[in-house]
A protein has these predicted regions:
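Loop-to-transmembrane-helix transition segments
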Residues: 9-15, 56-57, 62-86, 150-158, ...
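Hydrophobic/small/kink-forming positions within alpha-helical transmembrane segments
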Residues: 18-26, 53, 77, 81-85, ...
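Transmembrane alpha-helical segments that form core, pore/gating elements
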Residues: 29, 37-38, 52, 145-205
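Hydrophobic/aromatic residues within transmembrane alpha-helices
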Residues: 31, 40, 44, 90, ...
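Transmembrane alpha-helices of multi-pass small-molecule transport proteins
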Residues: 34-82, 161-164, 184-200
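C-terminal transmembrane-helix exit sites in multi-pass transporters
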Residues: 87, 106-128, 248-267
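Helix-helix packing/entry segments at the starts of transmembrane helices
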Residues: 100-105, 172-188, 224-255
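Hydrophobic transmembrane alpha-helices of multi-pass small-molecule transport proteins
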Residues: 125-141, 265-284
């Protein structure tokens, strides 16, 4: 059972991760204007793989790296690969915030599935907070659903795979070390994309593009480390509404780099997002 005193720590760690994640998404979208999306997906997973997997195996040894949760770890890694691939494809044709709003259907799926897969207790407050968070996201994004197309479907599909990744992250964290879990999240994607990329690579990236591609792996490692640690301290259904904080950091990046000042509706949406997370965390701590 998760110690209630650790819930706040789990929420804090997840918020840190969600501040970092949009940076990685922004790098991917920037590169997609000149490079094939498969090259960017390969860089994301191979960079993560080459930096972390050898280190994890060296530190933990064969017994620490291969254990009873290996099957779940690989399944989890496959889900994050599929979710990332569909999301990256979607942002080549639709704005990043719009894609993110569709991806964020995942926390609502987590609240429901955590009851059946993880045997976690769901409450009316958890459901309400998840819905408030989603409503806040729509206020922030104000997506034009009249322009709904196949690339929007890709973003929705990525949300489904991301939800399963969240569930399996919680499932394996009871028996696995953080660095091992972090390593397995890249193995399926790195292997699949390394096998596929020779058939799709067309041109040599510029030095600037290579440097940006090289940053994606480390950024992913840092964000996912905080992400995995968060799920060691709090239930999946408790953390679900907090994932909407990612849109807050997304808006902040837009303000800082693109001088895009939030409207009143966006500000109200941000307050809804933050409120949903605070309410569910305080309720968990006091019950």
């Amino acid at each position: 059972m998760v110690n209630k005193s650790n819930v706040l720590l789990g929420v804090t760690l997840l918020c840190i991760a969600l501040v970092i994640v949009p940076v990685n998404d922004a790098l991917a979208k920037y590169l997609s204007s000149d490079l094939k999306i498969l090259e960017i997906i390969w860089a994301r997973f191979f960079g993560h793989f080459i930096l972390l997997v050898p280190l994890a195996y060296y530190l933990k040894g064969r017994k620490g790296f291969f254990n009873s949760s290996t099957k779940h770890q690989l399944t989890r890694g496959l889900f994050i690969f599929l979710g990332t691939a569909f999301f990256y494809v979607s942002i080549t044709k639709i704005p990043l915030p719009n894609a993110l709003s569709l991806l964020l259907i995942a926390p609502i799926i987590v609240v429901v599935l955590s009851v059946y897969i993880l045997n976690e207790r769901i409450t009316l407050l958890k459901i309400i907070c998840a819905l408030i968070g989603f409503a806040g996201t729509l206020l922030v994004i104000q997506p034009g659903f009249a322009d709904f197309n196949s690339y929007s479907v890709y973003a929705l599909v990525s949300g489904l795979f991301y939800a399963m990744y969240l569930i399996y992250t919680r499932k394996v964290n009871f028996s696995s070390d953080s660095i091992v879990s972090l390593s397995y999240s890249t193995i399926p994607g790195a292997i699949i994309m390394t096998l596929l990329i020779p058939f799709f690579w067309e041109s040599i990236p510029s030095l600037n593009q290579i440097m940006i591609m090289g940053c994606i792996g480390p950024v992913v490692i840092i964000s996912h480390f905080f992400f995995i640690k968060a799920y060691q301290y709090a239930e999946a259904s408790v953390l679900a509404p907090i994932h909407y904080f990612e849109i807050v950091s997304n808006v902040l990046i837009s303000v800082i780099f693109f001088k895009d000042i939030p409207t009143i509706a966006v500000s109200i949406g941000i307050m809804c997002i933050i409120s949903s997370g605070v309410l569910i965390s305080l309720n968990q701590k006091n019950t």
